[in-house]
Structure formats: C-alpha cells, structure tokens
C-alpha cells in the first residue's frame, strides 16, 4: 500500500479551512463548502482503477466507482438556491465508502 500521509494532511487542511472560512464569511452571506470525492473516473485515478477498480468498487456500499455526473449533481446543488442555507459542510461523494471506515 502507498503511504498517503501528505495527501491526507492536505485534505484535513481543506476541511478545516472550509469550516473556518464559512464562519468568517457567513456574516457576509457567503457560503463556503467542500466536496470530498471518493474514487472517481478521472485521469488521476486511471492507473489505480485499472489495477484495482473492481475491488475499490466492492468497498463502496453503492458498489461502483463514481462518475462525473455524480460530482456534478452535488456541485449544482451547492451552487443553487437549494444549497443557500448550507455552509461549512464537507460533503462526501464516495458511494458510502466513508461509512465503512
């Protein structure tokens, strides 16, 4: 397995920054949120998915790898009126993988 210390630390930093900026910018009626993607079809994940895509998909309760339209739906929600009262949230879009760790 590959060590992911620096990657994990950078993601934790993004999560903290999201909450801190939401608190700071909320009085200006500015929402700040983050999307935390799990494994998705992408150039970055291509080699990993080729080597282990089936086993990664089995880890997700939804049983598959994320697709671009899965991510787009969350982004549209946050950018729309429907997400106007959501701030400081880190939304996992991972097929439920977060629930298994």
Listing of model-derived features with the role each one plays in the protein:
Residues 31-41, 79, 92-94:
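Conserved SDR Rossmann-fold cofactor-binding beta-strand/turn motif
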Residues 60-71, 82:
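A conserved structural motif in NAD(P)-dependent oxidoreductases
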Residues 1-6, 20, 29:
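Conserved catalytic loop/helix region of short-chain dehydrogenase/reductase
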Residues 10, 18:
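Active-site helix of classical SDR
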Residues 23-27, 84:
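Alpha-helical segment proximal to the catalytic Tyr-Lys
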Residues 2-3, 27, 37-60, 70, ...:
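A glycine/serine/threonine-rich, flexible loop-to-helix segment
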Residues 3, 7, 15, 90:
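Catalytic tyrosine of NAD(P)H-dependent dehydrogenase/reductases that use a Tyr as the general acid/base
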Residues 76, 87-101:
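Short C-terminal tail/terminal secondary-structure segment
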């Amino acid at each position: 397995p590959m060590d992911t210390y620096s990657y994990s630390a950078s993601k934790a930093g993004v999560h903290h920054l999201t909450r801190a900026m939401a608190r700071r910018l909320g009085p200006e009626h500015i929402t700040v949120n983050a999307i935390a993607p799990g494994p998705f079809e992408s150039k970055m994940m291509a080699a990993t998915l080729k080597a282990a895509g089936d086993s990664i998909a089995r880890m997700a309760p939804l049983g598959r790898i994320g697709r671009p339209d899965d991510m787009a739906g969350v982004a549209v929600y946050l950018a729309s009126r429907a997400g106007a009262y959501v701030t400081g949230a880190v939304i996992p879009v991972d097929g439920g993988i977060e629930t298994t760790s």
